[in-house]
C-alpha cells in the first residue's frame, strides 16, 4: 500500500516542504519504490508584520496539505542555536502543529542528528552530504533547491526509514 509522507523544515522566512510516495515491494525480494511527489518552499517577507507572516505560513501550508494529501507528516525538531532565531522558529512550528491538528494528521519529529544519521550513516554529517544523499536516494539528477526543500525531503526520507 502506498504511503505519502510530507517532510517539513519549519522556519518563519522559509518553510521547506517535500513529499514522497513510498510503495513497498510485494515480496521480500522486491525493494520499496520511493518517488518524489513534490517539493518547494513557503516564503514570507521580513517587511510584513510577524502575525501576518504566520498567517501566510498557515494558509499556504493548508494549501500544500490539501494538494498533497499526506498520510503522515515528518518535522525537523527545533535546534537551539541563537535565542532570537529559536523563538521565531518555535512560532512557525506552532503554526505547523495547528495546521496538522486541523487536518487530523499524525506527525513524527526528528532531530538534525537523527536525520543526518538516517541518510548518511553519520550523525555529524554536513549539509552537503545530506543533500547528496537525498538526491541519490530519490534518484534525482540534481540536489533539490532551495536547501530548505532538500532538508524537508531528508526529513520525509528519515520518516520512511523509521517506519
From Swiss-Prot:
Top enzyme class: hydrolase
GO biological processes: DNA recombination; DNA repair
Gene: ruvC
Residues that hold Mg(2+) 1 according to the record: 9, 148
Full protein name: Crossover junction endodeoxyribonuclease RuvC
Keyword Nucleotide-binding: no
Top-rank taxon, per record: Bacteria
InterPro entries: RNaseH-like_sf, RNaseH_sf, X-over_junc_endoDNase_Mg_BS, X-over_junc_endoDNase_RuvC
Cofactor: Mg(2+)
Family listed: Belongs to the RuvC family.
UniProt main location, coarse: cytoplasm
UniProt-listed Enzyme Commission number(s): 3.1.21.10
Record localization: Cytoplasm
Entry keyword Secreted: no
Upper lineage: Bacteria, Bacillati, Cyanobacteriota, Cyanophyceae, Nostocales
Keywords: Cytoplasm, DNA damage, DNA recombination, DNA repair, DNA-binding, Endonuclease, Hydrolase, Magnesium, Metal-binding, Nuclease
Transmembrane segments: none
Organism field: Nostoc sp. (strain PCC 7120 / SAG 25.82 / UTEX 2576)
Subunit note: Homodimer which binds Holliday junction (HJ) DNA. The HJ becomes 2-fold symmetrical on binding to RuvC with unstacked arms; it has a different conformation from HJ DNA in complex with RuvA. In the full resolvosome a probable DNA-RuvA(4)-RuvB(12)-RuvC(2) complex forms which resolves the HJ.
Active site: 9, 76, 148
Cited function: The RuvA-RuvB-RuvC complex processes Holliday junction (HJ) DNA during genetic recombination and DNA repair. Endonuclease that resolves HJ intermediates. Cleaves cruciform DNA by making single-stranded nicks across the HJ at symmetrical positions within the homologous arms, yielding a 5'-phosphate and a 3'-hydroxyl group; requires a central core of homology in the junction. The consensus cleavage sequence is 5'-(A/T)TT(C/G)-3'. Cleavage occurs on the 3'-side of the TT dinucleotide at the point of strand exchange.
One Gene Ontology term, aspect cellular component: cytoplasm
Textual note on the cofactor: Binds 2 Mg(2+) ion per subunit.
Binding site for Mg(2+) 2: 76
GO molecular function, one term: magnesium ion binding
Catalytic activity entry: Endonucleolytic cleavage at a junction such as a reciprocal single-stranded crossover between two homologous DNA duplexes (Holliday junction)
